[in-house]
Regions:
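Divalent metal-coordination and catalytic microenvironments
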Residues: 36, 52, 57, 79, ...
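Positively charged n-region of N-terminal signal peptides that target proteins for export
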Residues: 1-5
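Metal-associated gating/positioning segment near the N- to mid-region
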Residues: 80-145, 163-173, 239
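Extracytoplasmic/secreted proteins, especially bacterial periplasmic and envelope-associated proteins
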Residues: 54, 61, 113-120, 134, ...
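Histidine-rich, glycine-flanked metal-binding segment
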Residues: 26, 38, 43-83
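Metal-coordinating catalytic core of metallo-dependent amide/deamination hydrolases
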Residues: 25, 147-261
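Bacterial N-terminal signal peptides
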Residues: 7-21
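Cleaved targeting-peptide boundary
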Residues: 23-30
Length: 261
């Protein structure tokens, strides 16, 4: 069995839902899991009759009888199935509110709700998420520091789109983006970002990278979550898309895109 499995193993029948909460932050103590049927993510054959030892977030032993370190947490799986942690490659931890609730809530409420979402992800077996749109930088920091229970987060930061694109959630009652005006709530809280032309796209991309984005998210097609742009629209010019990619490449990372057409 590879030692590169995700540190937290989650039983599919909620075996560890209470005992392992917060383990992604506290990996200093050892955990020994016995009496589990283990799916290693490769073979269809479940591994049985083995004990599994996790030390410092790494699987260090798998045998019929492992060395049990002093003070180790011991878990009897009761014959349940144990799997590697799941990975969600398209998550929105910060975008958990309906439009009506979100537009009438302050940034603190958005943040509180996101902590609940992060814990739910973890309790359902997801130990890693790629967050593709949303101001999840502080949530990631809180999880990494052990303040909040949740999975590892790879944030994109705000999804970047053109004016009238998938990130433009202004209502008809709001003034044009070309004049001074209070931005729509998702833009105000940095969940999404509008950028037009090469210069603005470069700046928006670099700002997300400055905040700690591990990849960049742009929108190049319409969506159901933005009422002003039909699904079949083409958004961003090739040069604008190229600008985002060039800025991301400068940081040795990549651009992912919302695409419907």
């Amino acid at each position: 069995m590879s030692r590169h499995f995700l540190a937290s193993l989650i039983a599919t029948m909620a075996l560890l839902s209470h005992s392992i909460s917060g383990y992604t932050q506290d990996t200093s103590s050892a955990i020994v899991i016995s009496n589990a049927r283990i799916f290693d993510g490769v073979s269809e054959q479940l591994i049985e009759g083995k004990q599994l030892l996790i030390e410092d977030g790494i699987i260090t032993a798998l045998s019929e009888e492992v060395r049990i370190p002093e003070g180790a947490m011991q878990i009897d799986a009761g014959g349940r199935v144990l799997t590697p942690g799941f990975i969600d490659s398209h998550a929105h931890l910060m975008l958990q509110l309906s439009f009506g609730e979100g537009f009438n809530s302050d940034a603190y409420y958005w943040a509180y709700v996101s902590t609940q979402a992060a814990e739910i992800y973890l309790q359902n077996g997801f130990t890693t998420v790629r967050d593709v749109s949303g101001n999840s930088f502080s949530l990631k920091k809180a999880i990494d520091r052990g303040i909040v229970d949740g999975p590892r987060v790879f944030p994109s930061g705000p999804m970047i789109s053109q004016t009238s694109g998938h990130s433009d959630h202004r209502t008809d009652a709001q003034a044009s983006a070309m004049v001074a005006d209070e931005p729509a709530v998702p833009m105000k809280y940095d969940m999404v970002q509008l950028a037009d032309g090469r210069t603005e796209v470069l700046k928006a991309t670099r700002e997300a990278l400055r905040r700690g984005a591990s990849q960049i998210k742009i929108a190049v097609g319409g969506g159901t979550g933005s009422y002003a742009d039909p699904l079949d629209t083409t958004q961003y010019t090739p040069d604008e898309i190229r600008a985002a990619v060039e800025a991301a490449e400068d940081w040795n990372t990549y651009v992912t895109a919302h695409v419907y057409n």
